[in-house]
């Protein structure tokens, strides 16, 4: 039995997220179906994270234990031959037996993209969230300073039944504008359910003048979901990289 590591890109627009669900199209489900076909026995694919419905990935890391004589390149090519066009295995290689895509991950980089142009974005509309206002970049950057570091991010988690620790480390939040696109780059050791989208929604409320930068600090300290901002739509979010 060999342990294969994969780097996978996908357009999450038509999927119900990463995690397999009976009767629904998911990324994990599609990958497992192809590998099970290839091996002739059930194969479980372990992802570095579980992206939500409609969220994309440029470089999701995953691994799977398989009994096959195919080389990593042959496995990659087989998968890409039978996967839908909106999922692509960029890389396949052999990993150490103990490698686990989720538990060995040291950090993740997510980017949330907003469109702030004057006209509708035709060609990248599935990968951005369109804003009908010009957010205050400086105010959002000030607010982001309160959100970096090691904190209890319970206010920014959509799962009220979360029993495990909601303490996480967010190393950096970078907010930059390039022409008609506004990028929110988040790097951290791990993120809670919907956390990046709630952080983004909260920062956008600051940018729109609906709350002050200082209110973000109060929301963080409250450990109460109702004190943070709205959950930004899924299409603007993309997992860019997983660090090991």
Language model regions located:
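Structured-RNA-binding interfaces characteristic of tRNA pseudouridine synthases
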Residues: 1-244
């Amino acid at each position: 039995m060999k342990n294969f590591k994969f780097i996978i890109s996908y357009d999450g627009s038509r999927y119900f997220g990463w995690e397999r669900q009976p009767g629904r199209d998911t990324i994990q489900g599609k990958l497992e179906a192809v590998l099970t076909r290839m091996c002739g026995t059930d194969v479980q694919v372990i992802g570095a994270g579980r992206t939500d419905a409609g969220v994309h990935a440029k470089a999701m890391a995953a691994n799977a234990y398989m009994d096959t004589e195919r080389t990593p390149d042959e496995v990659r090519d087989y998968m890409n031959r039978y996967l839908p066009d909106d999922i692509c295995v960029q890389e396949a290689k052999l990993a150490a037996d103990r490698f686990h895509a989720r538990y060995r991950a040291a950090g993740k980089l997510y980017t949330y993209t907003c469109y702030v142009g004057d006209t509708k974005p035709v060609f990248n509309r599935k990968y951005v969230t369109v804003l009908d206002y010009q957010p205050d970049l400086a105010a959002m950057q000030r607010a982001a300073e309160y959100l970096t570091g090691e904190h209890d991010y319970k206010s920014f988690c959509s799962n009220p039944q979360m029993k495990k620790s909601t303490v996480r480390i967010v190393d950096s939040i970078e907010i930059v504008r390039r022409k008609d696109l506004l990028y929110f780059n988040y790097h951290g050791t791990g993120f809670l359910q919907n956390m990046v989208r709630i952080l983004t929604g909260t920062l956008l409320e600051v940018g729109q003048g609906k709350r002050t930068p200082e209110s973000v600090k109060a929301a963080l300290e409250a450990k109460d979901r109702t004190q943070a901002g709205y959950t930004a739509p899924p299409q603007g979010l993309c997992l860019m990289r997983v660090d090991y």
